[in-house]
Every structure is written in structure tokens, then in C-alpha cells.
Regions:
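Structural detector for short beta-strands of small beta-barrel domains
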Residues: 1-14
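Generic hydrophobic-segment detector
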Residues: 5, 31-32
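Hydrophobic beta-strand residues in large extracellular and virion-surface proteins
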Residues: 8, 20-22, 41-44
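Generic "edge-of-domain/loop-turn" microfeature
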Residues: 13, 27, 35-37
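Short aromatic-glycine-enriched beta-strand elements
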Residues: 13-21
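Short, structured beta-strand/loop micro-motifs enriched in basic residues and often containing a Trp
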Residues: 22-30
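Short nucleic-acid-contacting surface segments enriched for D/E, G, S/T with interspersed K/R
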Residues: 33-46
Length: 46
């Protein structure tokens, strides 16, 4: 972890799969904990 740093532009949930779309990097699958903690517009490090 730690190599991806950017702004969350979208959140998605597909069944039990949780995703965050990070500007300039694309879509990442994350845990439910991360998904619920992060808001659109937040800067995150993955």
C-alpha cells in the first residue's frame, strides 16, 4: 500500500464488492470498512 494517492471521485457497491474510483488511477476494490469510512471528495492512500 501507499503507492496510490488521490481523490475519490466515485463510490460503488456491486453485491458484496465495494469499489472506489480514484482520480487518475481508476477503480479499486476495497473492504467494507474502508468503503464506509471514505467519502466522495476525500483524499485517500491505498
Amino acid at each position: 500500500g501507499g503507492e496510490i494517492f488521490g481523490k475519490v471521485v466515485e463510490k460503488g457497491r456491486h453485491g458484496k464488492l465495494y469499489t472506489l474510483t480514484i482520480r487518475d488511477y481508476g477503480v479499486f476494490v476495497v473492504t467494507k470498512d474502508v468503503y464506509e469510512k471514505v467519502k466522495v471528495g476525500d483524499e485517500v492512500m491505498l
